[in-house]
From Swiss-Prot:
This is Glucose-6-phosphate 1-dehydrogenase. Induction: Transcription is maximal during early logarithmic phase when inducing substrates such as glycerol, glucose or gluconate are abundant. Transcription decreases during stationary phase. Catalyzes the oxidation of glucose 6-phosphate to 6-phosphogluconolactone. Can utilize either NADP(+) or NAD(+). GO terms for biological process: glucose metabolic process; pentose-phosphate shunt, oxidative branch. It comes from Pseudomonas aeruginosa (strain ATCC 15692 / DSM 22644 / CIP 104116 / JCM 14847 / LMG 12228 / 1C / PRS 101 / PAO1). The gene is zwf.
């Protein structure tokens, strides 16, 4: 993980008028410029199929950018500087002749970053056309998820890109890896002997990873109904978080050292055969309910819905890792849409002390928890046992938190968005926050066996009302092991 070096490049953004680019990528680039983290010679080429005057499209971009950037962070001077970097080029990404104009617009002296904010089905065609235009040799390509919908299709996508680009110049995005708290997992684990010496099956009882979304499918029906929550969230985000929690110490902080250790975790994931799905996995689909006191439709009532869809909008599962460090330690993963709140957190539950000396009725209190909040209010909290204060309390125990809120502790005016970090790293040529080909494929291989089991059983997802924490069966999933999900849910 090298220090930040601000190096120049040309950033070609394919799909520049799409939702991702307008909602996330351009605001992130604006913020980097605001923080003086874009080199003065860096240029941004906005590429899309839409014809018309470039000035009109750039005016639309400015309007969307003003909506996306908080008013207190908008600076007309920064915008003018950013605007001077921008050019718009209308092109058909699959037409080789369109790349003549791109070739003329690119600075021959600078590296080219080609960001594919497009469907994966056109990745290969874009790569082929970049190569035919003589641009491949100095280009880094950035691939947005989803990379395929199963192992076979992900291999097809990866192989199509690999025909023209080596792995060292392929950057696969998982935006969770750009979150400040996720990056802090590396420092937390490997810079503090307090934790790393306890980070194993001798001291940890179990681990929870929750990624809850308050929204529904938000107009993504066409994509989501073909994917479902397992493909959309577990295959990438949750398994990446699991890897960072479970991996062994890397030999150094280079990209491949970190990714080698993550792959070892993915290889060690215990398969879940079809006959164990009922006891180890819960699928759910939200029905009509309430969010913030307002009535919201069920999944099958959403606009353009297929009324017979059995796509899951919720998944909870118990994952076991077959290695010495984690043998006997279950990892409980949970993710869903239309939850009561937007929440991403990891909870490490430590074991009780080996000998119990306090009052029996207090035994349920005697365990430490490390709570890693990814959103909202990014930070870390360690729950420890202390004596309750007061002369008449005796040796009455209570739980007390040791808090580390990033925004408060470091007096940060704002916590950078994940895409800001990821765009910065790719412009500097750093791969440590990006996903390697074998990570993608081992994650798909593990998820594919779950999907095959579901298809074999042909069971419908369990209903849960919007605004709840999922099907009742997800409570039973952990209760079966004598546990409960952390928090006042």
């Amino acid at each position: 993980m090298p220090d930040v070096r601000v190096l120049p490049c040309t950033l070609a953004l394919f799909g520049a008028l799409g939702d991702l680019a307008l909602r996330k990528l351009f605001p992130a680039l604006y913020q980097l410029d605001r923080e003086n983290l874009l080199h003065r010679d860096t240029r941004v080429l906005a590429l899309a199929r839409d014809e018309g005057a470039p000035a009109e499209h750039l005016a639309t971009l400015e309007q969307r950018l003003r909506l996306a950037v908080p008013a207190k962070e908008w600076d007309d001077v920064v915008w003018q500087r950013f605007r001077e970097r921008l050019d718009y080029l209308s092109m058909d990404f699959l037409d080789p002749q369109a790349y003549v104009g791109l070739r003329e617009a690119v600075d021959d002296e600078l590296p080219l970053v080609a960001y594919f904010a497009t469907p994966a089905s056109v990745f290969g065609g874009i790569c082929e056309n970049l190569a035919a235009a003589g641009l491949a040799e100095r280009t880094r390509v950035v691939l947005e998820k989803p990379i395929g919908h199963d192992l076979e299709s992900s291999r097809e996508v990866n192989e199509a890109v690999a025909r023209f680009f080596p792995e060292s110049r392929i950057y696969r995005i998982d935006h969770y890896l750009g979150k400040e708290t996720v990056q802090n997992l590396i420092a937390l684990r490997f810079a503090n002997s307090l934790f790393e010496t306890q980070w194993n099956q001798n001291h940890i009882s179990h681990v929870e990873i929750t990624v809850a979304e308050k929204v529904g499918i938000e107009g993504r029906w066409g994509y989501f109904d073909q994917a479902g929550q397992l493909r959309d969230m577990v295959q990438n985000h949750l398994l990446q978080l699991l890897c960072l929690i479970a991996m062994d110490p890397p030999s150094d902080l280079s990209a491949d050292s970190i990714r080698d250790e993550k792959v070892k975790v993915l290889r060690a994931l215990e398969p879940i055969p079809a006959e164990q799905l009922a006891s180890r996995v819960v699928r759910g689909q939200y029905t009509a309910g309430f969010s913030d006191g307002k009535a919201v439709p069920g999944y099958l009532e959403e606009e353009h819905a297929n009324r017979d869809s059995d796509a899951e909008t919720f998944v909870a599962l118990r994952v076991d890792i077959r290695n010495w460090r984690w043998s006997g330690v279950p990892f409980y993963l949970r993710t869903g849409k239309r939850m009561p709140q937007k929440l991403s957190q990891i909870v490490i539950h430590f074991k009780e002390p080996p000998h119990y000396i306090f009052a029996p009725e207090q035994r349920s209190l005697i365990s430490n928890r490390l709570i890693i909040r990814l959103q909202p209010d990014e930070g870390i909290s360690l729950q420890v046992m202390t004596k309750d204060q007061g002369l008449g309390k005796g040796m009455q125990l209570r739980t007390g938190p040791l808090q580390l809120s990033f925004s408060e502790t470091y007096h940060a005016a704002r916590i950078p968005d994940a895409y800001e970090r990821l765009l910065l790293e790719v412009t500097q040529g750093n791969q440590y926050l990006f996903v390697r080909k074998d990570e993608v494929e081992f994650a798909w291989k593990w998820c594919d066996q779950l999907i095959a089991g579901w298809e074999r059983l042909s069971e419908a997802p369990k209903p849960y009302p919007a605004g709840s924490w999922g099907p009742v069966a997800s409570v039973a999933l952990v209760a079966r092991d004598g546990r409960s999900w952390y928090g006042d849910f």
